[in-house]
Amino acid sequence: MGADASLPMEMCSNFDAYELRRLTRRFKKLDVDGSGSLSVEEFMSLPELQQNPLVQRVIDIFDEDGNGEVDFREFIQGISQFSVKGDKNTKLKFAFRIYDMDRDGFISNGELFQVLKMMVGNNLKDSQLQQIVDKTILFHDKDGDGKISFQEFCDVVEHTEVHKKMVLENI
């Protein structure tokens, strides 16, 4: 990648030229088959994601074009959200998108159930998990439409400082 190729990436990410060069090398190392994009298996070799039960959701969000793989641009833009320079709103939007599986701008009862199921596995019975989901929606759905909007989500996590935990230190 020449200087021309990295300039737009600097403008649409939170990384400077040096960080982009490092990330380019890391991407190429992860791209074992040399295809120019990361498969789920290649992506899973990132130590930061190996123990994360939501790794498939992270990959789905990074994969903006929905082709099942993460190309370099998607990788940089995705990782950029976890930069220490990333802003709170961007991090909250990413966290919201983990739950908003169909990308309609809302977290439905079913979506919340699916994501929580990924996190708790079989530690709770489905009926117990459904009760938690129902109560969560009921309590935080301020406009009564049966789903959680981005603003309602932000109201819930506002005081948790979750955005400060959404940082990869050694990218």
UniProtKB/Swiss-Prot annotation:
Domain of life from the UniProt record: Eukaryota
Q: For this chain's UniProt record, which GO biological process terms are given?
A: calcineurin-mediated signaling; endocytosis
Site Interaction with PxVP motif in substrates of catalytic subunit: give positions: M118, N122
**Region called tax-6/calcineurin A binding, residue ranges:** 131-136
Q: Which GO terms describe its cellular component?
A: calcineurin complex; endoplasmic reticulum; sarcomere; striated muscle dense body
What's the family?
A: Belongs to the calcineurin regulatory subunit family.
Q: What does this protein do?
A: Regulatory subunit of tax-6/calcineurin A, a calcium-dependent, calmodulin-stimulated protein phosphatase. Confers calcium sensitivity. Plays a role in egg-laying, fertility, growth, movement and cuticle development. Plays a role in sensitivity to CO2 levels. Regulates expression of tax-6 inhibitor rcn-1. Negatively regulates nicotinic acetylcholine receptor (nAChR) sensitivity to nicotine. Negatively regulates lifespan. Involved in endocytic processes including coelomocyte endocytosis, intestine apical endocytosis and synaptic vesicle recycling. May negatively regulate autophagy.
What protein am I looking at?
Answer: Protein phosphatase 2B regulatory subunit cnb-1
